[in-house]
Amino acid sequence: MKKFNILIALLFFTSLVISPLNVKANENIDSVKEKELHKKSELSSTALNNMKHSYADKNPIIGENKSTGDQFLENTLLYKKFFTDLINFEDLLINFNSKEMAQHFKSKNVDVYPIRYSINCYGGEIDRTACTYGGVTPHEGNKLKERKKIPINLWINGVQKEVSLDKVQTDKKNVTVQELDAQARRYLQKDLKLYNNDTLGGKIQRGKIEFDSSDGSKVSYDLFDVKGDFPEKQLRIYSDNKTLSTEHLHIDIYLYEK
């Protein structure tokens, strides 16, 4: 019994010594990453306005059980007569970063959840085609029994803030990062004015979003590492059509006002 008590005491003492060192190491890593983040001031007003428009002013495209064998280029899929509720659009052209990805979904029943753009969009009905990058998942065998709410951990200047569970939801077992990111940035723009200029109440200057799945998969974006001034280039980050398992999935967001 005496040996057992000594062992417990040693384990307790060891945990006291080791734990602070681990925390400090993690804090050092986070501080380095924080310094590497891009600043809002690096972006033009046009870029910020278009990011705001893409994520907050427009609704994402949502389609279920769609199929097409049509293509414009080898790395695209063309869905003719896709839209029934948008007056200005008729066809949908989805771009991928490889022809292999397009072939994988060609003539398959799929669900789509991408953010659209129309400037410099070519391939379908002239002036009546919306373009996207990725946002595609299989329709068969990928549905949850009920919609799942994805928890968000939010830190602003290192202080954790409470976020309600209704901000990001999905009905898929495997979901594209784009579907999650579209909802998360919509929340950040509407509630925290993420892409507003300073004069319009945009206090956030730098930020990072991470999507962390139970299988160890992780995808992260620098929220102000924005390519170009227009959605045609800004949304290209989704052309890889990355997906994550929704089992034990959560989102971590780090925002800084300086």
From Swiss-Prot:
For this record, the Gene Ontology CC terms, alphabetical, are: extracellular region
One Pfam family here: Stap_Strp_toxin
Cited InterPro entries: Enterotoxin (IPR008992), Staph/Strept_toxin_CS (IPR006126), Staph_tox_OB (IPR006173), SuperAg_toxin_C (IPR016091), Superantigen_bac (IPR013307), Toxin_b-grasp_Staph/Strep (IPR006123), Toxin_bac (IPR006177)
Q: What is the effect of changing F72A?
A: Complete loss of host cytokine gene expression
Q: Please give the annotated consequence of changing D212A.
A: Complete loss of host cytokine gene expression
Disulfide bonds listed in the record: none
Signal peptide segment = 1-25
GO terms (molecular function) for this protein are: metal ion binding; toxin activity
Keywords (alphabetical) are: Enterotoxin, Metal-binding, Secreted, Signal, Superantigen, Toxin, Virulence, Zinc
> Binding residues for Zn(2+), per the UniProt record?
D212, H248, H250, D252
- Gene3D superfamilies linked: 2.40.50.110, 3.10.20.120
Q: Which co-factors does it depend on?
A: Zn(2+)
Q: How is the cofactor bound?
A: A zinc-binding site contributes directly to formation of the homodimer.
Tell me where it resides.
Secreted
PROSITE patterns linked: STAPH_STREP_TOXIN_1 (PS00277), STAPH_STREP_TOXIN_2 (PS00278)
Question: Main role?
Answer: Staphylococcal enterotoxin that activates the host immune system by binding as unprocessed molecules to major histocompatibility (MHC) complex class II and T-cell receptor (TCR) molecules. In turn, this ternary complex activates a large number of T-lymphocytes initiating a systemic release of pro-inflammatory cytokines. In addition, induces B-cell proliferation and differentiation in the presence of T-cells. Causes also the intoxication staphylococcal food poisoning syndrome.
Relate the assembly described in the record: Homodimer; zinc-dependent. Interacts with MHC class II molecules composed of alpha/HLA-DRA and beta/HLA-DRB1 chains.
Q: Give the protein family.
A: Belongs to the staphylococcal/streptococcal toxin family.
According to UniProt, the name of this protein is: Enterotoxin type D
Q: Give the species this sequence originates from.
A: Staphylococcus aureus
